[in-house]
Swiss-Prot record:
Glycosylated sites: 408, 415
Intervals, Lumenal compartment: 339-456
Gene name tied to this protein: CREB3L3
Record-given protein name: Cyclic AMP-responsive element-binding protein 3-like protein 3
Region described as Disordered: 1-20, 47-120, 365-423, 435-456
Region (Basic motif), start-end ranges: 240-269
UniProt function note: Transcription factor that may act during endoplasmic reticulum stress by activating unfolded protein response target genes. Activated in response to cAMP stimulation. In vitro, binds the cAMP response element (CRE). Activates transcription through box-B element and CRE. Seems to function synergistically with ATF6. In acute inflammatory response, may activate expression of acute phase response (APR) genes. May be involved in growth suppression. Regulates FGF21 transcription.
Keywords: Activator, DNA-binding, Endoplasmic reticulum, Glycoprotein, Isopeptide bond, Membrane, Nucleus, Signal-anchor, Transcription, Transcription regulation, Transmembrane, Transmembrane helix, Ubl conjugation, Unfolded protein response
Species lineage: Eukaryota, Metazoa, Chordata, Craniata, Vertebrata
Annotated source species: Bos taurus
GO cellular component, one term: endoplasmic reticulum membrane
Domain of life, per lineage: Eukaryota
Assembly behavior: Binds DNA as a dimer. May form homodimers. Interacts with ATF6. Interacts with SYNV1/HRD1; this interaction leads to CREB3L3 ubiquitination and proteasomal degradation.
């Protein structure tokens, strides 16, 4: 019941007057005479020692649960499930917009941050950092605070009441200072993600360390960053942009270096392949010349072989013709059949020559005495020719007649009909000789001739 009355009174007191100071709010709540919570039992006296107060870590957690930053982008936030909370009437986040002018509100002192500890290990005011220009920031408006008492149980409220009662005497800070210190602690926690950006400076401040490339790019962009932390969102964005450019530049340099090495390797290989190709081309030209010379030599050899073949053929032909002619001339004279014919007893008959003056007389020719059946079974081819020879013909004429007889014999062997005809003619001539009339009785003149012949 008292809680409802207190809430109604607080709402009626805060609604018409707008934003009030945090000290006035605390006086309104905890004043012993006119405070809203003056009738609420606090459990024990405020004068207990430090051993009965909540530990520092628990009190910090409790304060962070009330005043902590659920949203890292803004220093203050309001719980989503409650109608009341801490709100700040700002047009937009001051760290999201670039600075325009003025001096930003900073905490009483910035403290060094150690890894593994909370963002604000102590609330004692330390030596302030050197004054620096953080850029123009919109002025911070006064905050109006509304507290919902239904969220607190009596026991928790008693402990919190003890902690809050002891905190002003120990730390001498206001709610506004706690809010600002909480927001600065969030920024410091955000900067802990990049420890290489920080360097311990003089006192309790952190110093921003920039490389030469970053300084050059910042100077080129016309941006001036402070040497002390924390940085605003705009400054952080610009620093990230500069570092991204540096990384891109380094990666581009590495890629260009690799590309250059690759191209150099390709050029080296190409030069080696070109030299090898030229050497092979020279070898090919040399081989082509050798091939042409060998072809010319082959043609010459072929021409020589053709000429020698034709000459040998002509020589052989001439030799063959000469041998054939010699055979035709010599073979008839050395024929084995000619001697046999000459030595046969029936070829010649003895003829009585009475006188040289009667050599050409037909009466001196006397046919051989042959019986009708004494002739050889087969008529010889030269019988008629031998009988027609005159006894007084010279031997040269006989040889020529023999040669002709041999020729005729060769022809007779080829043509048997002609031979038979000649034999018939010879037989007819022999018959005629046999049928000749007998000679008359020897006259005295004839006897005288015979005697003269005998004397010769």
């Amino acid at each position: 019941m008292d809680g409802d009355l207190a809430i109604g009174k607080m709402a009626s007191s805060t609604s018409p007057m707008g934003p009030i100071d945090s000290l006035e709010l605390l006086d309104l709540l905890f004043d012993r005479q006119d405070g809203v919570l003056r009738h609420v039992e606090l459990g024990e006296d405020w004068g207990h020692g430090e051993d009965q107060v909540l530990p520092g870590a628990d009190s910090d957690d409790f304060l962070n649960s009330i005043l902590g930053s659920g949203d890292s982008d803004s220093p203050t936030w309001s719980p989503a499930a409650s109608d009341s909370g801490i709100s700040e009437d700002l047009p937009s986040d001051t760290q999201d917009t670039p600075p325009h002018g003025g001096v930003p509100a900073t905490p009483a002192g910035c403290h060094s941050v150690e890894s593994g500890k909370g963002p604000c290990p102590s609330y004692h005011p330390g030596p302030t950092c050197p004054a620096r220009h953080l850029g123009p920031v919109a002025p911070r408006l006064e905050t109006s605070v509304a507290i919902d008492l239904e969220m607190w149980s009596p026991g928790v409220y008693a402990e919190e009441q003890t902690d809050l009662a002891d905190s002003p005497s120990r730390y001498n800070l206001t709610v506004k200072d706690l809010l600002l210190s909480s927001s600065s602690g969030d920024l410091q926690q955000h900067h802990l993600a990049a420890p290489h950006l920080l360097r311990p400076g003089t006192g309790h401040c952190q110093e921003l360390v920039l490389t030469e490339d970053e300084k050059k790019l910042l100077a080129k962009e016309g941006i001036t960053l402070p040497t002390q932390l924390p940085l605003t969102k705009y400054e952080e964005r610009m620093l990230k942009k500069i570092r991204r450019k540096i990384r891109n530049k380094q990666s581009a340099q590495e890629s260009r270096k690799k590309k250059k090495e690759y191209i150099d390797g390709l050029e080296t290989r190409m030069s080696a392949c070109t030299a090898q190709n030229q050497e092979l081309q020279r070898k090919v030209l040399h081989l082509e010349k050798q091939n042409l010379s060998l072809l010319e030599q082959l043609k010459k050899l072929q021409a020589i072989v053709v000429q020698s073949t034709s000459k040998s053929a002509q020589t052989g032909t001439c030799i063959a013709v000469l041998l054939f002619s010699f055979a035709l001339i010599v073979l008839p004279s050395i024929s084995p059949f000619a001697s046999n014919r000459a030595e046969s007893p029936g070829d010649f008959a003895p003829v009585r020559v009475f006188s040289r003056t009667l050599h050409n007389d037909a009466a001196s020719r006397v046919a051989p005495d042959t019986a009708p059946g004494s002739e050889a079974p087969g008529p010889g081819p030269n019988t008629g020719a031998l009988q027609e020879r005159s006894p007084g013909s010279p031997p040269g004429e006989w040889e020529s007649q023999d040669t002709r007889a041999l020729d005729n014999s060769t022809e007779d062997l080829d043509n048997s009909t002609l031979v038979q005809g000649n034999s018939v003619k010879e037989l007819d001539q022999a018959t005629l000789l046999d049928c000749a009339p007998p000679e008359p009785a020897v006259s005295p003149g004839h006897v005288g001739l015979e005697a003269a012949g005998g004397e010769l």
